Every structure is written in structure tokens, then in C-alpha cells.
Design a protein with these regions (language model features):
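Helix-turn-helix
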Residues: 20, 28-62, 66
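Hydrophobic/aromatic-rich alpha-helical bundle segments in the mid-to-C-terminal region
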Residues: 5, 150-198, 209
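Amphipathic alpha-helical packing segments from all-alpha helical-bundle domains
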Residues: 100-116, 125-152, 162-166, 197-204
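Secondary-structure edge/capping motif, primarily at the C-terminal ends of alpha-helices
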Residues: 113-120, 183
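N-terminal intrinsically disordered/low-complexity leader segments
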Residues: 1-16
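Generic hydrophobic, amphipathic alpha-helix propensity
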Residues: 14-26, 42, 52, 67-71, ...
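Amphipathic alpha-helical linker/stalk segments
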Residues: 31, 65-98
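Short helix-capping/turn signature of helix-turn-helix
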Residues: 57, 118-123
Length: 209
């Protein structure tokens, strides 16, 4: 797993202040439709000083990564994904539930996540935050799931678990939502059905159900 660290030490702050900062950052990015919001703007909206943000999160990468992780605590989607992928075994039905949970969560995080993806080409802080969720969390979860399915004999013949996980990840990535739902006008329900169908046919045995 790739880990991004800050060289400077951070200072603990109250949970209330931390939440106010992270939710202010998310709200401002939604309003501005860009991820490069200044710390002064975030501080003003959260009712804190810039120094508080700097001391609590270290740098912009630390702030953005904490922000996207905080969003994951707003619903039980991530907890449910983790529970399924950390089980001792998995069936095709477990995998379907896993995909359903992610496809339900994707529209919630999309508005800011896609801004981070666009900025990631030239913005190391945005790249760090995006990788933390899309690779270190989502892709890693798919690798655990496909590993469990492989142990149960459910993968298509000749398909290795990690390669299968990367294929699934690409099919349900937020970039696909941008291309098909935003770009081509697909309805969310159409997107969900197509992703489930394509993933099923791509990685599972014909008798998987």
C-alpha cells in the first residue's frame, strides 16, 4: 500500500473542530468545482485560523486525504464494504452485494472525487488524496474480494485474482461514471445494470449464478 506522510508533526485538535474543517473543505470544493481551495477560505468557513489547519493536517495533502476519509464516515457504505471483503470466505452473491454497495456510494463521492482526479495530473496533493481512496481503499478491497472468490473456485478459468480485481476496478471507477452518466447521459440505473453485467461476465465462472 502506498503511504503518504507529512514530514512535520501535527497537533491534535478537537473532533468538533476537525469535522468543521473537513466539511468546510468539501463544501467549498463543491461550490467552486475545483480542489485548489485556499486554506484561508477553508479556515474562514470553518471558523478557525489558518494556523489551526496547518498544525492539524500538516500540509495540503494531509488535509485533502483527511477530507476524503472523513466523507467515508458519513454513511455506512465503507463499513459494509470492509465487512464483506475482510470475511473468511466470499460467494458470488457476496461479491454482488459488494458491487451494489460501491455503485450506490459512487454518486455520493463523485462530485469532489472527479475534481481530484482531474487535478491529480499536476497536483501531488490531489493525487495523494485520490490514491488513498481509489487505490489504497477501493482497489485493495477488490483484490481481497477476488482473492476470496478465487479460493472458492468462482473465478473464470485462467484469470488471476489481482488482474481480475484491476479489471473490475476499471469497470466501476469514477471515470466510467463520468464517461457514461455525465458524458453520454446514461441513467444511474442503466450504469448500475451494465456494470454488474459486465463485471459478472468478465471475471466469474459461467455457473456463478
Amino acid at each position: 500500500m502506498k503511504v503518504y506522510t507529512c514530514k512535520m508533526k501535527t497537533t491534535p485538535i478537537s473532533e468538533e473542530t476537525r469535522t468543521a474543517i473537513l466539511e468546510a473543505a468539501w463544501a467549498l470544493m463543491l461550490e467552486a468545482k475545483k480542489p485548489d481551495i485556499g486554506q484561508a477560505e477553508i479556515a474562514a468557513k470553518a471558523g478557525v485560523s489558518r494556523q489551526t489547519i496547518y498544525m492539524a493536517f500538516g500540509n495540503r495533502a494531509g488535509l485533502l486525504t483527511a477530507m476524503v476519509r472523513h466523507v467515508d464516515t458519513g454513511t455506512d457504505h465503507v463499513q459494509r464494504l470492509s465487512a464483506i471483503s475482510h470475511a473468511a470466505a466470499a460467494t458470488p452473491e457476496d461479491f454482488r452485494r459488494y458491487l451494489d454497495i460501491w455503485l450506490d456510494y459512487l454518486p455520493r463521492i463523485y462530485p469532489v472525487a472527479i475534481l481530484l482526479e482531474a487535478a491529480a495530473l499536476t497536483d501531488a496533493a490531489a493525487q495523494a488524496a485520490l490514491d488513498d481512496r481509489m487505490k489504497d481503499a477501493l482497489l485493495a478491497g477488490f483484490k481481497r474480494m477476488l482473492g476470496l472468490l478465487a479460493k472458492g473456485g468462482h473465478l473464470a478459468p485462467g484469470l488471476k485474482p489481482d488482474a481480475a480485481a484491476e479489471l473490475v476496478w476499471s469497470l466501476v471507477h469514477l471515470a466510467m461514471w463520468r464517461l457514461l452518466v455525465v458524458g453520454c447521459g446514461w441513467r444511474p440505473a442503466e450504469f448500475r445494470r451494465s456494470r454488474l453485467d459486465r463485471v459478472w461476465k468478465a471475471v466469474l465462472k459461467d455457473d456463478a449464478g
